[in-house]
């Protein structure tokens, strides 16, 4: 099927993390800052912009603490079936066991019997990391390679 479904209004933003960072807590933000390599000044600037944006929009984003495979069904159960859902991950899938990635794909297939799901994944196990769009519709998955990305987000090369 066509990947073109028009542009929809964003009705909710959700995040899942084993240990979500509270951007209102400077100690937690300092921990994030410590992860940026000292010679990567541009990445420090991007992080500061991201923290500022997260603070500005803190009430618009619902963060869940836990395992992705445990939390996603709960989030989906609260959504209206006429909603299109976009699941986005960036450089996470390479840290998840193969069987959990397959479980996620099967879960999204099953959930797509009630709701259209778009999964944009950056990273994974390819080198260079792929940017991939998977559309889940009526229990089936359709996948398309969009491009490649640097592991630190310094560049993207589109193939579409």
What are these regions, as identified by a protein language model?
Residues 1-65, 78-80:
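Class I S-adenosyl-L-methionine-dependent methyltransferase module
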Residues 7-9, 59-61, 65, 95, ...:
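C-terminal His-loop and adjacent cap/lid subdomain of alpha/beta-hydrolase
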